[in-house]
């Protein structure tokens, strides 16, 4: 059930809905921590499956577009987002990366509570507060100057010795007491209550009537200098904030300057322990390299500064009852266990299911049906079952066994829950499989995979239509798609003639997809898009691949025994060969126009990984340029990686590359390499 494509589409819908609630309506349904886990999981999936990345994905934005109800302010220097750490290990990795980039010199670290409010930029000209804007998308924000003028802790006039023009950045917030008072007043008036202080602060600042904002007990802490025309300011973030404190700006008194990472970790531990007693909401700690000149040396990567990181507080955990362990069927026949839970609210989201991965994972955690379990949403969109609460366990409960759970009394054996097919677990693998190649659940997932963006990219056929086409019997194997007619589609419920025509056109357009897309779309077990590209370049056409033997496959770099055996097994099945023949008869391109790699080409012997969003071309285009120059384009960072090309919103691959010492290339450096080649 939990295919990457389905999960990515569900995630984007969920994140976009929450963005609308959060940024536009100021009435979100989930906490910032829960939102972070959604974004983190989506980034992980897009890193693992780059063919699923789209320009409109929420991961491709810093924030949200400004509201048109307010004027637009262009930020002279972008308000960047921060990379996140969720453990001491990740924080230490950031510190070591920075040290290495700076040549192992010592540096001081600023430690600041990560306020859970609304980021704003305040510009002063000739001693007067001139403009105030929200973060917006990082490059443009909403002009909320009139509303910010009502906040008493924002000076309307700067001290005479202040720089002639400068911008400071701060977090507008509502204290816990102020939030409680505001909600009591709203309850008395019969108005809807705010979900949390952050929403209340954001909603207050986005009032079209400044008098409404003036009634709210808003406050601000300044956390950074955006820019200044005074070149005599100190080369220390700490001293700059101290300077602005002395000329009338409010700085958080809990900020600390430390000399070592151990001191920084201790600061975090103290803040986490005292989190509940803080007068405002905070969701972590921000660490910054103190020296401004060192900050400039370190620069940014994507849309995140290298010199700062946000160490988030732990995710919320709750207890609920695990009613049942269900089993879903994947496209290759994998039998995937998942927890069916008593509905429980975790960080503002009602959770009914959680991932369990496989039988070994369930037994390792000793999770049983009927248990009271601890659930958390940290790094997993599908929430995770952390552990059972043994003190609440029914003494008669039994350990979970996949084959016992799948036992079908009518067949007197374990069976696939969808088709009743026999199941097996290959030696050395963690997953059980349904052996029935005609299992309808498998084919539904296979069809979803074939039409997906990374494969044949047939627009208009998504998850739901794939299921309908399979269940209605219109498509019994993937080649049937190319024999559909508009009349066939018009038989389906809620299908109009224009939509049907568009789908038929999209199917026809897909016939010219490159060979590697076809190979990937066929869904051969263990053959991902990287392997499909290797096979396409090596064999040049599908029939040469179909006729190959195990020995030849094993001579191809990165094709191991498991992949080779899977390929041979796939093409030894006559039904698979018959599908490919029908694809060929329908006009699907089954040959490659790629040229063999010349060892004297500029990128020969180099292995590249591309991460994040590039401005000049898509990730797929960048990978094709690498291949055209003889290089290898991979999806995952390993010790063999020569270069990591880093775009905006880079994810976990960047952290992994830094931990392994892989050389990073900015987009401009990558383009320079292309031009010089």
Swiss-Prot record:
Residues 598-677 form the BRCT domain. Its cofactor is Mg(2+); Mn(2+). Signal peptide: none annotated. GO terms for molecular function: DNA binding; DNA ligase (NAD+) activity; metal ion binding. One of its GO terms (biological process) is DNA replication. Pfam families: BRCT (PF00533), DNA_ligase_aden (PF01653), DNA_ligase_OB (PF03120), DNA_ligase_ZBD (PF03119), HHH_2 (PF12826), HHH_5 (PF14520), Nlig-Ia (PF22745). Belongs to the NAD-dependent DNA ligase family. LigA subfamily. This is DNA ligase. The gene is ligA.
